[in-house]
């Protein structure tokens, strides 16, 4: 790949790799809690602490494909920097959700709600990128250039 192509996706790749490390951390927490409870064997049921860790991890895993899809679509079709920033914010919020779920379940609610809003923001960025592509294709006008012109004045 040439440097320009790598430059267009490097921030998205960094956020993706950070999310992989975070998933590993969550899985390690589940494994650690399972070993504390059952010795060496892994079971899905057990103490309340294990149930909370397992459920929090499962909830994060369930939302992960959606996050990756909208992160990369928003970054490639709209703008890499805001998409990567929103992706980092989502990872912080997901960490807050995970840790909050281990305590009182009401502590996880702000992380959950803000995470949904970040996913919506990335989705809207993706739609804006698709709309811009359609405008270029149909009318030959680039919406992104209009935004840059307006924002520099």
Swiss-Prot record:
- Lumenal-side stretches of the chain, per the record, are 1-8, 78-80, 129-153
Q: Where are the transmembrane segments?
A: 9-30, 53-77, 81-102, 116-128
Q: What membrane topology was assigned to this protein in its record?
A: Multi-pass membrane protein
Entry GO CC = endoplasmic reticulum membrane; nuclear envelope; nuclear membrane
Q: What biological function has been recorded for the protein in this entry?
A: Required for leukotriene biosynthesis by ALOX5 (5-lipoxygenase). Anchors ALOX5 to the membrane. Binds arachidonic acid, and could play an essential role in the transfer of arachidonic acid to ALOX5. Binds to MK-886, a compound that blocks the biosynthesis of leukotrienes.
The similarity annotation says:
Belongs to the MAPEG family.
Recorded protein name is Arachidonate 5-lipoxygenase-activating protein
Organism expressing this protein natively: Oryctolagus cuniculus
* Encoding gene per record: ALOX5AP
